[in-house]
């Protein structure tokens, strides 16, 4: 068998050294992430940015990749490595809210492409609010409520010292509420073929319509793996849908 890792492995153990660090200057979140990258690397920042006070960003025993993930997670983001370049992409973990699942998807996937499809339910709770706190040094505490809801059924509160502004608090609230939402989980296997014969490689973060007549549905790809045999190349997708 053949296995591999992305270029971002160079920013993680055992290739990159873990260190202890405390930022003594005021920085934006994006600046904190950028300064962790060695020369030759770039950062595609697609999440909210905000100001972080001095001595708020501190850590012990983290590699560059781990420390950047720490910053991105504060605002409900997800970090992934580019397939070809020395680039990290910071994007919202949930590009669409599961309680507002009305959007134009990135692509359509005909059911005829699927070799196998399985489905299971993920239990969850449709909470309508969550308290997001910035830690004892920042004094930020915000009750974020879903639009049009009373906020009478909140999820367990979350605390993150890097949440020092309202915008990351709101973004983190979306991620926390969405992670606990009642969902359906689909596993789909299909041949890896370039269009128009197939769908091409479908990456995590892609939104799609699974076209199957009255049984079709709309989902978000959260995992992709590729397997190779002597005769076939197959991609296996993990997809979630409210």
Residues covered by each model-derived region:
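A residue-level signal for beta-strand positions that form part of recognition/binding surfaces
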Residues: 1, 87, 129, 218, ...
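Short, solvent-exposed secondary-structure boundary/capping segments
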Residues: 1-6, 226-241
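Charged- and aromatic-enriched interaction segments used to assemble
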Residues: 3-122
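Acidic, small/polar-enriched beta strand-loop surface segments
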Residues: 69, 73, 79, 92-231, ...
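Solvent-exposed, flexible loop/coil residues
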Residues: 15, 131, 237
């Amino acid at each position: 068998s053949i296995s591999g890792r992305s270029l971002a492995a160079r920013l993680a153990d055992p290739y990159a050294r873990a260190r202890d660090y405390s930022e003594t200057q005021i920085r934006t979140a994006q600046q904190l992430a950028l300064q962790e990258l060695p020369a030759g690397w770039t950062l595609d920042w697609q999440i909210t940015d905000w100001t972080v006070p001095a001595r708020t960003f501190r850590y012990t025993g983290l590699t560059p990749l781990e420390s950047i993930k720490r910053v991105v997670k504060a605002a409900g983001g997800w970090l992934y490595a580019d397939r070809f370049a020395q680039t990290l992409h910071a994007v919202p973990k949930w590009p669409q809210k599961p309680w507002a699942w009305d959007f134009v998807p990135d692509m359509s996937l005909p059911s005829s492409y699927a070799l196998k499809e399985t489905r299971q339910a993920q239990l969850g709770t449709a909470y309508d609010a969550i308290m997001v706190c910035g830690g004892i040094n920042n004094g930020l505490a915000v009750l974020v409520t879903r639009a049009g809801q009373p906020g009478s059924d909140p999820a367990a509160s979350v605390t993150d010292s890097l949440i020092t502004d309202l915008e990351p608090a709101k973004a983190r609230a979306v991620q926390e509420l969405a992670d606990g939402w009642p969902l359906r989980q689909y596993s789909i296997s299909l041949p890896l073929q370039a269009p128009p014969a197939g769908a091409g490689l479908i990456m995590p973060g892609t939104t799609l319509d699974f076209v199957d007549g009255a049984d079709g549905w709309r989902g978000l790809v959260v995992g992709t793996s590729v397997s190779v045999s002597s005769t076939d190349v197959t991609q296996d997708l993990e997809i979630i849908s409210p």
